[in-house]
A protein has these predicted regions:
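Charge-rich, low-complexity N-terminal segments
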Residues: 1-77
C-alpha cells in the first residue's frame, strides 16, 4: 500500500536547525522513499511498511540525539 506522509519537526532546543537538517538528511538515505522538502514540512512517499519502519528508527534516533521535540505527522493513504 502506498502512503504519503507530511512531517513537521519542532525540536525544543535553542539549536534546532541541526536537528531538523540531520533528520531530513537521514530520511533521504532510504532509496525506495521519495522525499520532498519545503519550508514548513518534509513529505515522504512510498510503501506504508517501509515508511513506518523508517519513522520508527529515525524518530527514536532524533530524540536520543537531540532530546525532546514536537513531531507532527499526517498520513494520506
Amino acid at each position: 500500500m502506498e502512503v504519503s506522509v507530511d512531517i513537521s519537526l519542532y525540536p525544543l532546543a535553542d539549536e534546532f536547525i541541526p536537528a531538523i537538517n540531520e533528520f531530513i538528511e537521514r530520511v533521504q538515505q532510504y532509496p525506495s522513499i521519495a522525499v520532498v522538502r519545503n519550508d514548513f514540512s518534509t513529505q515522504l512517499f512510498g510503501d506504508y511498511e517501509q515508511i513506518m519502519e523508517l519513522l520508527k528508527i529515525e524518530i527514536k534516533l532524533s530524540w536520543e540525539q537531540y532530546g525532546k521535540s514536537i513531531l507532527v505527522v499526517k498520513f494520506l493513504g
